[in-house]
Each structure stands twice: as C-alpha cells, then as structure tokens.
Design a protein with these regions (language model features):
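Histidine-centered nuclease catalytic patch
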Residues: 17-50, 62
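Short Cys/His-centered divalent metal-binding micro-motifs
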Residues: 51-71
Length: 97
C-alpha cells in the first residue's frame, strides 16, 4: 500500500455522489481511475496519483458495481473527476505529490 492509498484513512469523501455518498470518513478509501488513459487495464489498477478520496458507496457507483438510477454514467464520471481534482489539492497540501 502506498503513502497515497494509506492517506485515505479518515479523509472525507471527495466524490460526493448525491443520494449515494455515505458522508462518513470511516468509509473513505482511495478510488483508482477506471480509464485506460491512467494506466488501468486487465486487472491492473491505474497509478495512484490518478485517484480520488471516495467512500465505498461512491467508489462502487463509479466502478459500476452499484447503479445510480437518478444519474447518467457521464454524471457519475463527472462527480468522480471533480472528487479527483479536490483530492489532488489535498494530496498537494499533505506533501504527497
């Protein structure tokens, strides 16, 4: 486990999908980008910097393990991307990137 993935412990979810997010730092993990451009493919996770602090529910929605009936796939992806950008600011402030 890298310093970035370990840093998720106790952080707030930054993805914040409405109607999905647990809103509890106890459930926050490091959610890796699921797009191939970030290095993901065939069982390989993307690089750690291509990620976001996300609760387990938001991560499941992003990974399409849990449907989000009130949102399109593009809207879920956009929420994740916004969370990614907020997470980069946090990582920078922590000196991790």
């Amino acid at each position: 486990m890298s310093r970035i993935t370990k840093s998720a412990n106790g952080e707030d979810c930054q993805v914040r999908i409405i109607g999905v997010c647990k809103g509890d730092p106890a459930y926050t993990i490091w959610s890796h980008c699921r797009h191939g451009a970030a290095g993901k493919g065939r069982g390989i996770k993307s690089i750690d910097v291509a990620g976001a602090y996300a609760c387990t529910a938001c991560d499941a929605a992003y990974d399409q393990l849990q449907g989000v009936p009130h949102m399109s796939r593009s809207e879920v992806d956009l929420d994740w991307f916004h969370g990614h950008m907020r997470s980069l600011v946090i990582l920078t402030n922590k000196g991790l990137i």
